[in-house]
A protein has these predicted regions:
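Histidine-anchored nucleotide/phosphate-binding helix
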Residues: 53-68
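A donor-sugar binding/catalytic signature common to diverse glycosyltransferases
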Residues: 115-163
């Protein structure tokens, strides 16, 4: 998989980094890896996505709670690379959320900054399942054969290619 592409005049990821040996060593100490792909809060799809949770950060709070209950799973929270795009940077960021929640103190959580070019596709290939809010990488993960748990309504959640529970309790049950 290659990450060298242009969309809406923005060049994304001229190089995509493979999972390094430190990550692979860390992951080897867990039963499974679950990547969590976020969105940018300014994305025009966000207001329409919030049918189960108040917003993406409400969902991330629940993800953090579940991660703390499941120490045998490595959760990899991947901030959207567009989060820090020049002239579009979010005021409210996943990186800010991660800092305020001190996720770096959790042994079973890895936070991937929006500035890191870590391959999301390699994460998907190593995953037990993939969690998204409503990012289109969920559709890509589904095409790659991964089970995808969506927490927000997306352009593809009406098709039987992903899991899209309709209540917070159902999302919580599917996560376990």
């Amino acid at each position: 998989f290659e990450g060298n592409f242009i969309m809406a005049g923005v060049k994304f990821w001229p190089e995509m980094s493979q999972l390094d040996k430190d990550f692979l060593e860390l992951a080897s100490h867990f039963q499974q890896v679950v990547p969590i792909f976020t969105n940018v809060i300014f994305d025009t799809s966000q207001p329409h996505a919030n049918t189960v949770f108040e917003d993406m950060f409400d969902w991330l709070d629940m993800v953090l709670e579940i991660a703390r209950e499941n120490r045998d799973t490595l959760f990899v929270i991947r901030a959207h690379p567009d989060e820090t795009r020049v002239r579009k940077a979010s005021r409210e960021t996943v990186e800010g959320w991660a800092t305020s929640r001190e996720v770096q103190k959790e042994a079973n959580i890895v936070f991937v900054s929006p500035r890191e070019t870590l391959s999301s596709y390699e994460l998907i290939q190593r995953s037990k399942f993939v969690m998204i809010y409503n990012s289109t990488i969920g559709l890509e993960a589904s095409i790659m054969g991964a089970a995808v748990l969506c927490a927000g309504k997306a352009r593809f959640t009406q098709y039987p290619t992903v899991f899209f529970p309709q209540t917070i309790d159902e999302v919580r049950r599917k996560m376990k």
